[in-house]
Amino acid sequence: MRPTHHIIYNPRSAEGRHAGVIRALRAASPPEHVWLETTAPQHATTLAREAAKAGATVVVAAGGDGTIHEVVTGLMSVAAHERPALGLLPCGTGNDFAFASGIPTDLHLAYQRLQTGTARPVDIGRITLPDGRAEYWANTAGIGFDAKVVKRTKRLRWIKGQPLYVIATLLTIAFDHEVI
């Protein structure tokens, strides 16, 4: 049996800048690649969990770091023996996890690697929230300076790509500090 890939695509990642490439990849993909589009926050978590339970061998997060977070949370909610491999098509603004993992930012190359590459383990972090829910991450976790930078990026959406994070970092250094 050929592997089945369930590709969870967030059309709002990077403000939809990758929509044309995603359409082309989708049109050329084999029938065992199931494309699922998210429609709301946390939808990727549900889709990933359902894909795992449906027997997908690979669940692909096609989005940014937020989409990866949601997909990982969905995959970690199923038993280890049911858990498929995680794949990535980097469609976000920063694509930090893709960069750290050596995944090409060219979507055609990344898609080709999904079909020819080999799986490798990644570390997953877990936190249990006060309401009892578990959240997972595969990239980084932060509660201080880095969290302020990410919060600032939400107000600077008119800046595109990697410069968004550089400018948000510089503004956070300049305005969110305490002299001791």
Which residues fall in each region the model found?
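Short beta-strand scaffold positions
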Residues: 61-62, 88
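Catalytic core of DAGKc-family lipid kinases
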Residues: 6, 38, 76-180
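Polar, low-complexity loop segments and adjacent catalytic/binding residues used for recognizing
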Residues: 65
